[in-house]
Every structure is written in structure tokens, then in C-alpha cells.
């Protein structure tokens, strides 16, 4: 078959299963109220949990960073691209999120995907065993695959099953890998148990706090701080394009671990550093996150989460047991989920349909993503509209 025809057939198969993904075009800044594809909508799609993506303080820091450093870094971090802005940000991130370690150090990455690949491929390799939660993010799954380690998938959130697998493993290097807040269900991993298991079995514990950083814990310091957890075995990955409202990611761990990543993590070494202006904006974001304003935004987000759960129960949906900003509505089939999304979209509400392979087959869902930028009036609009997709999805 012609190579192009093979792809065309593959796309036709995707269409037949109701799995084609489509991009929508935003004409305005990320926020609760946006213009998307030329229409005014209320967005429940972004991960801008604190509503900082268009914050004037961050925008000005970004602009000032560009005026000072220019538009690009010019090279990789190890070949001329590591600016004072990057170095300052890493020090700030280590101080902000490294309370679990006696000697924390941070390493900044352009994306969360690259950060997870770096941590897993540098710490594991042939002869190692990675124990990965069944619902981990794709970047953790790919990092485990690329590491060439043996990979064992343990049932979602099941610390007892993980313990049994660790006891049966005699690999010299073991890594437990888990999201903290799971991005499609909104539930939280049993972090205290995972830390205890890592220490008992002499394993690294790599946690991806993409959806907890900035939101959970005192001053938004993340899921580990929320639980008061400390361990030299911890490797913490945080994302800066969600609650922080900018872009990039970071790894915080003991300084020896970070130096190892600098020397061995290919997704850090062999790529151009992010523009310094991005680091400047993230530094400004950290200041807001840790401030009284950050506390107020987290409190408002918490109230929105509570109200949303009440709305879902009142409108006869069966909400997943999530007390985070991710509120999924599991529908089941791809077609019914797409119909539900379209019904909401017709009423000016953007609530994306999440389908396989992002979630397991038969669990397609609407994913309501809440932000401190939302108002209770926005939730009232959502409440009034939720009756329509029930009929469409039935």
C-alpha cells in the first residue's frame, strides 16, 4: 500500500472510532472567559488552576525578561544557554518545593514531558525495575519505556499490591513512579504509603506533581508539603504551565541526584534552553503563589470545587471522588461523550471530551477543569446547561 494511503486509512479508522482529536483556536489570553474559534465561551478546559496565565505581574516580568535577555537563550544549558534568570529560578524552586530534602537542588526543563523523561531515563536503565501506577501520565509511561528498565505496572493507587511486587524484586535499582494528582480522575496517590515503601525497599520514589504544585499544601508548595513528607529517596517533578501559569517544568531532589541528571539526562543535555524571559515570568509567578493573593486564589478555588461537586450531585451526574480542580464526568462511549461536549459547546461552555488512549476504553468522559479565575456565576451557567448533555449522552 502507498505510504500516504496507509496514513489515510489510519485516520479513517480513528474517525470510525470517534477518536479524532481537533485543535481549537483561541483568539484571547487563557482565562475563564475567552474567544475561541471566533465565539465567546466560558472555558472549563485549561489547567490554569490559579488563573495566573494572564496575570499582569507575570506578563510584565515576561516582557522585562525579553527586553533584558532577548527572545531566545541561544543554546543548551551546557553550551551557552543557561542565563542568570534560569539559575535564579532554580534556586527559588529548590527553596520553594525542596522541603522534603536536607540538601535540595532544582533543575529547570522546557516541558514536563522532558522533565519526566530525564528523571526516569537517568535514574533507571538495564537491570533496574520501575514500578509504575496503572494510570500514570503518558510522559511517565514513555520515560519508563525509554529507560530500558524492566517495567511493572501496579493497580491504580494500590499500595499493598505495590508492596508485594517490591518484596518479590531483587533488582539492584528500583524506582516507584506515580502522579500525585491524577490528571483525568482528580484523585490523589497514597503518598505517605509510597514514601514508606520506597524507604523500606531501598527504592527511589519519583512523583509527578503537575496538578498539585501551586494548589496543594501551605503556600501551594505541592502535594509532598501538603502531607508533610520528607525522604532522601524522593525525586519531585513539578510543572510550571498549569497552576503557575507560564511554561516549563522542574525536578527537585538531593543535590547529588540533580548533578547526576545534569551529567546523564539526555532530554536536558541535548536541547536548547527555554527563553530566559520564561524563567523571569515563572519567578514572578512563584512570588504570587506564595503570597496572600495566592492563598486567596487557592481558597476561592477550593470553594469552587465544593460548589461544583454539589452541582454535579444535584443534576444527577455521578461525580468521581475528586476533591481537586479536576472534576471528571465519566460517560462511557466515545460517541455519547462527544455529543455531551457538543451540547455544552452550543451553550457557550467549553468542557472537553477525553477519550482513549488518554483514558481506558469505555471510560470516556467530560473533564471539568476549574480555575480561580472562574466565578460562581460561571458555575451557575454550567449547572443550567448540564441537563442537556444528560439527554444527549443517554
From Swiss-Prot:
Pathway: Cofactor biosynthesis; biotin biosynthesis. GO terms for biological process: biotin biosynthetic process. InterPro entries: Aminotransferase_I/II_large (IPR004839), AON_synthase_class-II (IPR050087), AONS_Archaea/Proteobacteria (IPR004723), AONS_Proteobacteria (IPR022834), PyrdxlP-dep_Trfase (IPR015424), PyrdxlP-dep_Trfase_major (IPR015421), PyrdxlP-dep_Trfase_small (IPR015422). Substrate binds at residues 21, 137, 358. Pyridoxal 5'-phosphate binds at residues 112-113, 183, 211, 239. Its EC number is 2.3.1.47. Homodimer. This is 8-amino-7-oxononanoate synthase. The gene is bioF.
